[in-house]
C-alpha cells in the first residue's frame, strides 16, 4: 500500500494572503479571522512561508483547499506591538540570541478533512523550509480549548514550553515548540508534491 501524495502549494505574499483570507471563512471555530491586508502587513519585510494543502473531492470533480499554515520569523527585537509582546512572553523559554525562531502564526484543517494527514504534510514541508533557511526552532501558540490542535501538535512532537492560565481554563494559552535538525527531517512520513506559485 502506497502512502498518499499530498498536494501542497507555496504562495508568494499577496496571492497567499488572499488565499488564506478565503480559506479562513471555512473555520467557524475561529472568531477572529485574518484579512488579506492583515496578513500582508504582518509578513511584509520578513521571512515567511504560506502553505496550503489541496485535495480532490470524492467524485474528482474539483480540487479544494483543505488545510493551511502561515509562518514567519520571530525576531528578538520586534517593532509590532503584538509580536513584541509575544517575544517578551517567550524570552525565558526560547533562545533568541543563538538561533533563528520560526513562528507558526496561522494554521488549521477544515473539519471535514481532519485526520487525513494534510496538516502533518504541511508541517513536514514547513520543517524542510525552516531547516533550509537556518531556523533552529518552530514555536506555536494555541488555546487550551483547541483539543484537536493540541493533540495534533503532540503527535508532531511539539513540546509545551509555557502555559498562561486564564480565569476560564479553555482560554488558557499554550505555547509549544519543536527544535529542528536533520533527525527531524529523517522522521518525515508524508509524500508531498509541492508547487511554488
Feature annotation, model-predicted:
Residues 120, 132, 144-163:
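Conserved active-site alpha-helix within GNAT-family acetyltransferase domains
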Residues 109, 115-128:
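Conserved acetyl-CoA-binding loop-helix of GNAT-fold acetyltransferases
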Residues 109, 140-150, 167-169:
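Conserved beta-strand-loop-alpha-helix junction that forms the acyl-donor binding cleft
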Amino acid at each position: 500500500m502506497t502512502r498518499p501524495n499530498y498536494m501542497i502549494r507555496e504562495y508568494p505574499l499577496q496571492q497567499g494572503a488572499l488565499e488564506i483570507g478565503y480559506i479562513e471563512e471555512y473555520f467557524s471555530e475561529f472568531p477572529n479571522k485574518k484579512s488579506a491586508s492583515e496578513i500582508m502587513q504582518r509578513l511584509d519585510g520578513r521571512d515567511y512561508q504560506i502553505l496550503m494543502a489541496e485535495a480532490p473531492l470524492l467524485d474528482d470533480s474539483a480540487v479544494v483547499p483543505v488545510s493551511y499554515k502561515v509562518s514567519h520569523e520571530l525576531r528578538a527585537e520586534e517593532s509590532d506591538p503584538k509580536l513584541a509582546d509575544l517575544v517578551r512572553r517567550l524570552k525565558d523559554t526560547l533562545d533568541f540570541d543563538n538561533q533563528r525562531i520560526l513562528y507558526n502564526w496561522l494554521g488549521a484543517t477544515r473539519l471535514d478533512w481532519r485526520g487525513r494527514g494534510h496538516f502533518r504534510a504541511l508541517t513536514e514541508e514547513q520543517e524542510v523550509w525552516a531547516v533550509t533557511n537556518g531556523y533552529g526552532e518552530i514555536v506555536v501558540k494555541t488555546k487550551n480549548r483547541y483539543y484537536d490542535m493540541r493533540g495534533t501538535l503532540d503527535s508532531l512532537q511539539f513540546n509545551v514550553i509555557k502555559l498562561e492560565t486564564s480565569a476560564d481554563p479553555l482560554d488558557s494559552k499554550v505555547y509549544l515548540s519543536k527544535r529542528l535538525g536533520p533527525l527531524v527531517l529523517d522522521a518525515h512520513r508524508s509524500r508531498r508534491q509541492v508547487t511554488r506559485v
